[in-house]
């Protein structure tokens, strides 16, 4: 690898480690492109060999925005709170870097969603998300009424605080906190998780990743927002329509030797070991 990207959380410890990593890479003849802030109008150079993400899940999602559709592998180094998307921790940063430079890793492809927002029939925005699309109401707003179609079929109207549409990767984020299922990243599905539904029969639903989901507001109380990966938000009214489907380009995540998804899951969710009583 001739050049590596660095996306660094705004944190003194993460910044210090990033400085050390830059020097370490320079000593091995590897150039570095470093950023701490990400915007949609500034993308990563397409010739990066990979991107190290020093931070938490929010920083990782920012890095996924930074690379856009380019198949640049990402590796997360945990410096944040949760770290479901992190491959390793701060103490193993340089051993991970050594393995990556030697090519001792595999790639896991994580599905993304393409979100197109229409306002009065005109396209307002088009984005891709790795985790989720969230429609929710403000603290003082009335119930959100979200009319939901799957491949043109009138599925239901969700009445409640909102709705989360997530990828399997995003199933361990907001969707999990709202009562949604944990879905393995290799499962080709999309999860619809209502937030505090007023109708008790509105339960989380997993649909194939081949479907196209359309969301509209059946009624339009004020203060309804659409949030994309927790990074960007849009106001939503009755004049808006959301189209959500599987994106053409997945995110490529670096998997180091000996790392398994279930190890991360078990650690983060604090699951126990053997059967009760043993």
From Swiss-Prot:
InterPro entries: ATP-NAD_kinase_N (IPR017438), ATP-NAD_kinase_PpnK-typ_C (IPR017437), NAD/diacylglycerol_kinase_sf (IPR016064), NADK (IPR002504). NAD(+) binds at residues 57-58, 131-132, 142, 159, 161, 231. GO terms for molecular function: ATP binding; metal ion binding; NAD binding; NAD+ kinase activity. It catalyses: NAD(+) + ATP = ADP + NADP(+) + H(+). Disulfide bonds: none annotated. SUPFAM superfamilies: NAD kinase/diacylglycerol kinase-like. The active site is at 57 (proton acceptor). Pfam families: NAD_kinase, NAD_kinase_C. The keyword NAD applies. GO terms for biological process: NAD metabolic process; NADP biosynthetic process. Its EC number is 2.7.1.23. It is found in: Cytoplasm. GO terms for cellular component: cytoplasm. Its cofactor is a divalent metal cation. HAMAP family: NAD_kinase. Involved in the regulation of the intracellular balance of NAD and NADP, and is a key enzyme in the biosynthesis of NADP. Catalyzes specifically the phosphorylation on 2'-hydroxyl of the adenosine moiety of NAD to yield NADP. Belongs to the NAD kinase family. This is NAD kinase. It comes from Desulfosudis oleivorans (strain DSM 6200 / JCM 39069 / Hxd3).
């Amino acid at each position: 690898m001739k050049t590596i990207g660095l996306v660094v959380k705004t944190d003194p410890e993460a910044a210090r480690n990033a400085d050390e990593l830059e020097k370490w890479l320079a000593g091995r003849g590897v150039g570095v492109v470093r950023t701490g802030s990400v915007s949609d109008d500034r993308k990563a150079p397409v010739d990066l060999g990979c991107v190290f993400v020093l931070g938490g899940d929010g920083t990782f999602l920012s890095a996924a925005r930074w690379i856009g559709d380019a198949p640049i592998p990402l590796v997360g180094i945990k410096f944040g709170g949760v770290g479901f998307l992190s491959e390793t921790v701060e103490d193993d940063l340089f051993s991970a870097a050594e393995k990556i430079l030697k090519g001792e890793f595999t790639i896991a492809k994580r599905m993304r969603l393409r979100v197109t927002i229409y306002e009065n029939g005109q396209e307002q925005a088009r984005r891709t998300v790795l985790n989720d699309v969230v429609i929710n109401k403000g603290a003082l707003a009335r119930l959100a009424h979200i009319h939901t179609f799957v491949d043109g079929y009138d599925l239901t109207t969700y009445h409640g605080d909102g709705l989360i549409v997530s990828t399997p990767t995003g199933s361990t984020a907001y969707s999990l906190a709202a009562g949604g299922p944990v879905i393995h990243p290799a499962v080709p599905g999309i999860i619809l998780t209502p937030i505090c539904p007023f109708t008790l029969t509105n339960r989380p639903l997993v649909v194939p990743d081949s479907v196209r989901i359309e969301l509209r507001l059946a009624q339009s109380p004020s203060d309804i927002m659409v949030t994309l990966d927790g990074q960007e938000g849009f106001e939503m009214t009755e004049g808006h329509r959301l189209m959500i489907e599987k994106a053409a380009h997945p995110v490529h995540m670096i998997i180091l030797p000996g790392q398994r998804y279930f190890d991360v899951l078990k650690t983060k969710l604090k699951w126990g070991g053997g059967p009760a009583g043993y």
